[in-house]
């Protein structure tokens, strides 16, 4: 498994090189809507560390021209979560997000830490709903990487991984915002490579209450954190349903029965 970790690490470093060269803000207007900005709604996607290795192709295909303008900022800061917050605020001002009738937000893991802090500092009255993409599995990786692979973590993400690992999640308190939690049930390949360390951690629960975040609805998908970039079309209908209604519709409310690591056990 150590050989696999080295190979995977090299691939991630290559992905980082591509990310640094090609990362950019994604701003896409809904072609079907010619109304002024004050009558339009927008989706803001705050990705996470996985955006280093994955493109926004599936995100764009899943959320573009669905009645919303789509914004995916290149906001990650190698320095800190505070740096991420500053980048989000700069993006929000540049693209006049406060002028929209409603803004709906999809937060990945780093995005969740960033969004909550950003909203506390720069509250926008038109934030209507937020979906938090959370993973009891993937959220163990920042501390693991900090402790076992500090050099690799610093090469990939600078100080951001360390800041994330050392910062307890602070939930957003905003009664006027509809909040949903989408829970991933599948492990990533990288966590599989850290499986021995993962087994030494306290047991993980998929109970939505464990995330310490108020929610109006929750759902489960057998998707990994990588899949939430490359296969988000599978979860997009439920996310869009939440943005429009405040519920995940017919999405699964029971924890996934599958082994989170089953995909990788087959190839062991």
Describe each region flagged by the PLM:
Residues 1-9:
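Bacterial N-terminal signal peptides that target proteins for export
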Residues 75-77, 135, 184:
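Active-site loop/turn elements of alpha/beta-hydrolase fold enzymes
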């Amino acid at each position: 498994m150590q050989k696999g970790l080295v190979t995977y690490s090299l691939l991630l470093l290559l992905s980082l090189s591509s990310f640094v060269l090609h990362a950019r803000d994604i701003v896409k207007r809904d072609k079907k809507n010619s109304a002024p900005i004050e009558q339009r709604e927008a989706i803001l996607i705050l990705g996470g560390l996985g955006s280093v290795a994955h493109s926004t192709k599936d995100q764009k295909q899943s959320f573009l021209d669905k009645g919303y303008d789509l914004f995916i900022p290149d906001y990650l800061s190698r320095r800190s979560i505070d740096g991420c917050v500053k980048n989000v605020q700069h993006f929000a001002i540049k693209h006049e997000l406060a002028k929209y009738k409603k803004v709906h937000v999809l937060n990945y893991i780093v995005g969740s830490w960033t969004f909550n802090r950003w909203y506390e500092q720069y509250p926008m009255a038109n934030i209507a709903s937020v979906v938090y993409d959370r993973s009891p599995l993937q959220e163990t990786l920042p501390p693991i990487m900090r402790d076992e692979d500090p050099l690799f973590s610093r090469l990939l993400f600078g100080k951001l991984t360390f800041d994330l690992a050392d910062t307890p999640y602070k939930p957003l308190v905003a009664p006027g915002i509809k909040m949903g939690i989408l829970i991933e049930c599948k492990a990533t390949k990288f966590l599989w490579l850290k499986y021995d360390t993962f087994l030494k951690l306290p047991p993980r629960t998929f109970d939505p209450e464990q995330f310490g975040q108020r929610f109006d609805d929750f759902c489960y998908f057998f998707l990994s954190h990588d899949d939430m970039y490359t296969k988000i079309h599978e979860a997009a209908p439920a996310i869009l349903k939440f943005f429009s209604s405040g519920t995940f519709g017919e999405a699964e409310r029971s924890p996934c029965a599958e082994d989170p690591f089953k995909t990788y056990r087959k190839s062991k």
